[in-house]
């Protein structure tokens, strides 16, 4: 019965493809919040310094005293007093272990909800012409709008580019596919090797299979839980 319900939610073409590829499962949970877990995370600075966010409240990285990090209510917020034009774009890593979850507010105001067993590589300040982060695992993004500086999520063999929107990406390294689900706005997905692109609209999900680099788009129901 569960299989019938799942297949009814996707198009005939996608159904036929996945019927021939049963090793890849299609997640039907519309996830706009992290899965239940405990608020556990570690922050690894570019310098190699590691901070357990369960223990620390407010602090500054050793390599940049102009940046302030506020850590409260299971949320790490980055505040920079340094203009982006003079900042250096060194990448830090927020690590959420298995069974944990955490929220990150980036320097531009964008919010990222990290799920269990997830890593996000990000700069303290977006100094270049693009806002680029790297994701391993699953996260829900609420991207602050900036028409002059697109926001790009690099994951696996693909990249997702937006100006301001809400979307979820599931890209665990052990999975055979990357799932990008759009809640609002629009996103452009690009397969890096072939440069093939696809445009997502609200209530659509892109399934990118890592073994062949193919992208398929189908409609999803945002009320499914």
Question: What are these regions, as identified by a protein language model?
Answer:
Residues 1, 10-225:
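A residue-level detector for the "anchor" residue at the start of short, highly conserved motifs
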Residues 6:
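Conserved beta/loop motifs at nucleotide-recognition and modification sites
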